[in-house]
């Protein structure tokens, strides 16, 4: 079958590993169902993909379909200091994206591969505006939990009380969810957050929430059934995760080119079952020097084998490079390994891994649950603090090590060591493992043939196919003409438009 006959879906991603990889996982799943996927994101991230060496411009076969990449310039030099201001960058990306995306769609139509649907992730809600202007359906992939989706929804619409400057420590009671303490709700919603620009970025999606015909969630029904049932009455949500776990499509993720992917696995192969603690704080969390030292001494004192991912901060990020305690590597010898990157999915699936010290980002949370690995929670901010509460108190697969950045303290080596020992041996470790294995089984059943997530993704595929037939059978010349009109219209955007976008993003809603 030629690729021209396949339904073509355009994935538009905000740049960054935590944004691109979940959308890429969704893309390979849709490709396995017989779709042709194009993933587009700014060239600034495309350079990282090419550097990693796991990239090709040619369509890659996945199941019955294909996936390919197409990058676009965002209009700023790579070292432009304005990139550090998220409000400014999002406005610039919207200004350029509204010109570029219609051109990509126009080019596809002229090549007899018309786009039938657009899917975006958070931070770029304007993609649904582009789709609507062209008469195309759109969907959104939400890459946090349904619980966090509900929290942001209720905050945006003012449906329940949240902490305020006058009452900063009130608890939050959301329908069909456990009570959230003030430091357990997504921290960007707290009035004292040092990251108000991230609150604006996330809530921007809720302004356009009525435009996508479907909101896909990287979770599974059995994990969050009460809040999913509740929110499904309000929004067209479909849980389709865990996306990384789907057996129908091979793993395809973007990594940093820091090491050979098999290096960690070769080391783990030499360790006994359930003997290694895996430590990783994701791609955006960087700990203070003192905290790194306390974790290091805790590992030395515990005598537990470990694999520790310590990613260096990006150049010019302003984040200080941290050092391990003096003589640390010599003292641990072969009992420990420190790396800059790891193939996390493979690591968590390895039988030698006993538990996972994690920052509780949603990708890592889903990977731990679906791999059956207990966790020690070390959240910092955002949805991480909410995920940590769920892991410890609801899913019961985790031990809480800290409550987040707002706690404003260094976790001592004694506290860390105590958690490490409890999570790897004794009655608590047994209970955590039993619960973790239960969720692993539930996750596998969700993505298996006929499972809850499999049924939802099939329903989504069927709907896109149905609307695709309507689009193709309508006047193709009319469709191309509509795209051409939009391209010409957006090409007239000026620098003043960008200023208006930045100001409107900051002021149109008092988040």
UniProtKB/Swiss-Prot annotation:
PROSITE patterns, sorted: UDPGT
Gene3D superfamilies: Glycogen Phosphorylase B
Pfam families to which the protein is assigned, alphabetical: UDPGT
Binding residues for UDP-alpha-D-glucose: 344, 359, 362-364, 367, 383-384
Purpose of the protein: Involved in the glucosylation of limonoids.
Binding site residues for an anthocyanidin: 19, 382
Record field: catalytic activity: limonin + UDP-alpha-D-glucose + H2O = limonin 17-beta-D-glucoside + UDP + 2 H(+)
GO molecular function: limonoid glucosyltransferase activity; quercetin 3-O-glucosyltransferase activity; quercetin 7-O-glucosyltransferase activity
SUPFAM superfamilies: UDP-Glycosyltransferase/glycogen phosphorylase (SSF53756)
EC number: 2.4.1.210
Coiled coil (UniProt feature): none
Family (UniProt): Belongs to the UDP-glycosyltransferase family.
Alphabetized UniProt keyword annotations: Glycosyltransferase, Transferase
Protein's name according to its UniProt entry: Limonoid UDP-glucosyltransferase
Catalytic site: 19 (proton acceptor)
Organism listed in the record: Citrus unshiu
Domain of life where this protein originates: Eukaryota
EC class: transferase
């Amino acid at each position: 079958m030629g690729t021209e006959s396949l339904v073509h879906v355009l994935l538009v991603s905000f740049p960054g590993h935590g944004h691109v990889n979940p959308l890429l996982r969704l893309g390979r799943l849709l490709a396995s169902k017989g779709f042709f996927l194009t993933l587009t994101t700014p060239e600034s991230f495309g350079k990282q993909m090419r550097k990693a060496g796991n990239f090709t411009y040619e369509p890659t076969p996945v199941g019955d379909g294909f996936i390919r990449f197409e990058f676009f310039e965002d209009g700023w030099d790579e070292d432009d200091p304005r990139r550090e201001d998220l409000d400014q960058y999002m406005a610039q990306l919207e200004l350029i994206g509204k010109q570029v995306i219609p051109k990509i769609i126009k080019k596809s139509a002229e090549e007899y591969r018309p786009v039938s649907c657009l899917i975006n992730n958070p931070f770029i809600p304007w993609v649904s505006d582009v789709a609507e202007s062209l008469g195309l359906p759109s969907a959104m992939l939400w890459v946090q939990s349904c619980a966090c989706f509900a929290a942001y929804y209720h905050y945006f619409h003012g449906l329940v009380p949240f902490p305020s400057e006058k009452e900063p420590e009130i608890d939050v009671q959301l329908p069909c969810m456990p009570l959230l303490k003030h430091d357990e709700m997504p921290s960007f919603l707290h009035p004292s957050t040092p990251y108000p620009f991230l609150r604006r970025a996330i809530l921007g999606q809720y302004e356009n929430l009525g435009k996508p015909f479907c909101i896909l969630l990287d979770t599974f029904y059995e994990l969050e059934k009460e809040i999913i049932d509740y929110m499904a009455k309000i929004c067209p949500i479909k849980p389709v995760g865990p996306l990384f776990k789907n057996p129908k499509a091979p793993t395809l993720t973007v990594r940093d080119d820091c090491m050979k992917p098999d290096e960690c696995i070769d080391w783990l192969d030499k360790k006994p079952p359930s003997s290694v603690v895996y430590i990783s704080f994701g791609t955006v969390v960087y700990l203070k020097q003192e905290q790194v030292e306390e974790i290091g001494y805790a590992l030395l004192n515990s005598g537990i084998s470990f694999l520790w991912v310590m990613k260096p901060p990006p150049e010019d990020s302003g984040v200080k490079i941290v050092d391990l305690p003096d003589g640390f590597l010599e003292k641990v010898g072969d009992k420990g390994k420190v790396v800059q990157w790891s193939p996390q999915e493979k690591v968590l699936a390895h039988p030698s891994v006993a538990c996972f010290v994690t920052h509780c980002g949603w990708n890592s949370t889903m990977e731990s649950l679906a791999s059956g690995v207990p966790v020690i929670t070390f959240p910092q901010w955002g949805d991480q603090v909410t995920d940590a509460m769920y892991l410890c108190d609801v899913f019961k697969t985790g031990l809480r090590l800290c409550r987040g950045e707002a706690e404003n303290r260094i976790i001592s080596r004694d506290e860390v060591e105590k958690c490490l020992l409890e999570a790897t041996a004794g009655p608590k470790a047994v209970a955590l493992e039993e619960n973790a294995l239960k969720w692993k089984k539930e996750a596998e059943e969700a993505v298996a043939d006929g499972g809850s997530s499999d049924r939802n993704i099939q329903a989504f595929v069927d709907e896109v196919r149905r609307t695709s037939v309507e689009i193709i059978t309508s006047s193709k010349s009319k469709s191309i003409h509509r795209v051409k009109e939009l391209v010409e219209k957006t090409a007239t955007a000026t620098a003043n438009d960008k200023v208006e976008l930045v100001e409107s993003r900051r002021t149109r809603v008092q988040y």
